[in-house]
């Protein structure tokens, strides 16, 4: 691991943290790809450790600290922001995101329903349909380059989420 500290005079009341690891979505199979891509949304909706997203907001009341996971094709990352007095809280959130991610079936089901509703609306938009065709033709029906669809969302498997997150 490599730690870089860079003090600046830009914002004296803010501390930023960035953690980046190699791998990202490239470590996942084609079948796992879209579940991996949705992982930051799942994390945001589910909370961490023993805290649901709602409980976590209550615990962080009065504090300025957050950590948000993200994933790209070749990297996984976590970004954090806090006030100087809340550095310990931000580091605790980082630790929980690494060691105790939370996966709540109800939250994942809600995310799935939301995506399906958005896709149903998008199917009536000619721009969406055109973009879908352009993407298919441009990338030769590559499973990692197709636009998300109801078929893909319906294949989401809650039981696979912890294993995908660990990769």
Task: Give the predicted meaning of each segment.
Residues 6-8, 67, 166:
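Residues embedded in well-ordered secondary-structure elements
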Residues 132, 158-167:
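Non-catalytic, conformational "gating/processing" segments within enzyme and secreted inhibitor domains
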Residues 1, 31, 165-167:
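Short, intrinsically disordered, charge-balanced linker/junction segments flanking boundaries
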Residues 11-44, 48-100, 111-120, 126-155:
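M16 family metallopeptidases and their MPP-like homologs
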Residues 4, 63-64, 160-162:
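Short structured motifs
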Residues 1-12:
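N- or domain-start disorder-to-order transition segments that initiate the globular core
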